[in-house]
Amino acid sequence: MGMRYRALHSWDVRPDEAVEIQKMLAGSVRFQRVDRVETVAGADVSFSGSRAHAAAVLLDYHDMRLLDVSFAEMDVVYPYIPGLLTFREGPVILRALEGIDEADVLLFDGQGIAHPRRFGEASHLGLLLDRPSIGCAKSRLWGEFREPDGERGSFSLLVDRGEVVGAALRTRTNVRPVFVSPGHMSDLSSAIEIALNCARGYRVPEPLRLAHILSLKRARMTR
């Protein structure tokens, strides 16, 4: 049984309409502790021209053993617009996730609520899938932070106008932090704990690292 999602809106919308969709749906995001995690999924997209190649992986949360993998591809015409990444990558990611078993928590290479409208890719896709989700981005989109201490596990809060929206998390000692934020049905402490547990010797958590490698390999095969 693959992961299923709810079609809450059209993907064929103008950027201004996409912004309004984000504003409308952001109020549906829920925050809660993520407990009893046995499996974790990650998804990433690589491009070959206008063709998007997505990989979704399902891993054992405890030993990061690969349990399932699925691929999807489609032509993408939606432009790259910061803050509207889901409208470019979301459809192909959802198609890839349909091919793997349901995970207890989902990791996305993007923002959760660390977003101008508190509705980044992890929040958006988590809401559509109705599953706990976490954003773990390699770069900051929104909010201010101070550099965390150099040790693995150190973090500093990501703050926007007095509101905590995420954290800069050091997943490897003396390596640049990643930017973690709750997506949907998660909270910041869970997001930090899960992202750190999934980072096994690399800066990027293993589900996202593996999904990136596999999607990039697929994209290169078509060039």
From Swiss-Prot:
One of its GO terms (molecular function) is magnesium ion binding. Its EC number is 3.1.21.7. One of its GO terms (biological process) is DNA repair. It is found in: Cytoplasm. Pfam families: Endonuclease_5 (PF04493). DNA repair enzyme involved in the repair of deaminated bases. Selectively cleaves double-stranded DNA at the second phosphodiester bond 3' to a deoxyinosine leaving behind the intact lesion on the nicked DNA. This is Endonuclease V. It comes from Methanothrix thermoacetophila (strain DSM 6194 / JCM 14653 / NBRC 101360 / PT) (Methanosaeta thermophila). The gene is nfi.
